[in-house]
Every structure is written in structure tokens, then in C-alpha cells.
């Protein structure tokens, strides 16, 4: 099981950082808990991964609650790549971020995935993010994949569901039920 888990990294939508631990221990959680890495080596791994996401060593001793949302997201990314996984799952990686920080996170995701030679699977409603980080896009509706193809083709998918979604139109085949008061 440990060998299998070593192959996966995860960036959770809400960050899922432990407020009781300093940033470096959050980043090094996997190496310490699952790989048995000693604390000194784990701290070095954490500092390296923090640097990879644009955070300096001064952040390492802070608690997650002392960080901005964008910094927390970068710490979460550092944790996701700390074990150098083969596959990284991203759950709404840009949710709650302003457009500039979202673009920074997207750039860091692309850089991290390429640097590791990893496969990335992202779940997102943010089409700017999907276009930037994806090679391929699949759209789910009603529990089924209704379109899939290269990211560059999503704007001309020919699929009315995809077209409605990417353009954010209320009219179309996707119906949003509104409760009446």
C-alpha cells in the first residue's frame, strides 16, 4: 500500500493543511509519516519544495493560519509534490483565488508537473485554469463524460453542453433548478 500511495500526490480544494503543524511539517507530512524520513531530511525536502513554489525559508516555521489564501495554496502544492509522485490530483486548484494568483498557481502546476514528468488529473470549473494546465479536457454531465478532446479544441467542441458551460450562459441544455420561496 505504501508503495502505491507514494505514486500519488493530491492538492485538495480547501488546502487541507494542519493548523497545528508549521508549514514545513505540512509539506513534509508524507515523507515523515509514510516514508519514515527523519525530521532533518524532511525539513530539507520541505524547504526545497517550498522554494519550487516560490516560497522562502521564512515561511517554513509559520502556521497555515498565518498565510494568505494564495500562500496556503502554494504550500498545498508543495505538499502534493513532496514525495515526487507519478500522478497528481488537483481538486479545484484555483477556487477562492483572485485571477492573478490563480494564474500563478496554474503556472506552478504546469512547472511542477513537467518537472516531475508526472501525470496530472484536475477537477475544475475554472475554464482559464483548464485551458492553461490541461493537454486534454473531459466534461462530465449527469455522471457521464459528454465530451473529451484536446484542450485546444474545447472552444470548438461542437457540443452544446460544453459550449453553454464554457461561455457561462444560463440558456441551453444544462438546466439549473431554482427553488421557489
Give the ranges of each region predicted by the language model.
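Conserved ABC ATPase signature
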Residues: 63-67, 71
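Catalytic Walker B motif of ABC-type/P-loop ATPase nucleotide-binding domains
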Residues: 88-91
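Short coil-to-helix segment of the ABC ATPase nucleotide-binding domain corresponding to the Q-loop/switch region
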Residues: 21-29
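Conserved catalytic motifs of ABC-family nucleotide-binding domains
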Residues: 84
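Helical segment within the ABC ATPase nucleotide-binding domain
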Residues: 103-116
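Conserved ABC ATPase "signature" region
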Residues: 40-58
Amino acid at each position: 500500500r505504501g508503495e502505491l500511495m507514494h505514486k500519488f500526490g493530491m492538492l485538495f480544494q480547501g488546502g487541507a493543511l494542519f493548523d497545528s503543524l508549521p508549514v514545513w511539517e505540512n509539506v513534509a507530512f508524507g515523507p515523515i509519516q509514510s516514508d519514515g524520513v527523519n525530521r532533518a531530511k524532511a525539513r530539507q525536502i520541505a524547504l526545497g519544495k517550498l522554494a519550487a513554489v516560490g516560497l522562502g525559508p521564512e515561511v517554513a516555521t509559520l502556521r497555515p493560519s498565518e498565510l494568505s489564501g494564495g500562500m496556503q495554496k502554494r504550500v498545498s502544492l508543495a505538499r502534493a509534490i513532496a514525495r515526487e509522485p507519478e500522478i497528481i490530483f488537483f481538486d479545484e486548484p484555483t477556487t477562492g483565488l483572485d485571477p492573478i494568483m490563480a494564474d500563478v498557481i496554474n503556472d506552478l502546476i504546469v512547472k511542477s508537473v513537467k518537472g516531475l514528468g508526472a501525470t496530472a488529473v484536475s477537477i475544475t470549473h475554472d475554464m482559464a485554469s483548464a485551458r492553461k494546465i490541461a493537454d486534454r479536457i473531459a466534461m462530465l454531465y449527469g455522471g457521464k463524460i459528454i465530451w473529451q478532446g484536446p484542450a485546444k479544441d474545447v472552444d470548438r467542441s461542437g457540443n452544446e453542453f460544453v459550449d453553454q458551460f464554457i461561455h457561462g450562459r444560463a440558456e441551453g441544455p444544462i438546466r439549473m433548478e431554482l427553488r421557489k420561496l
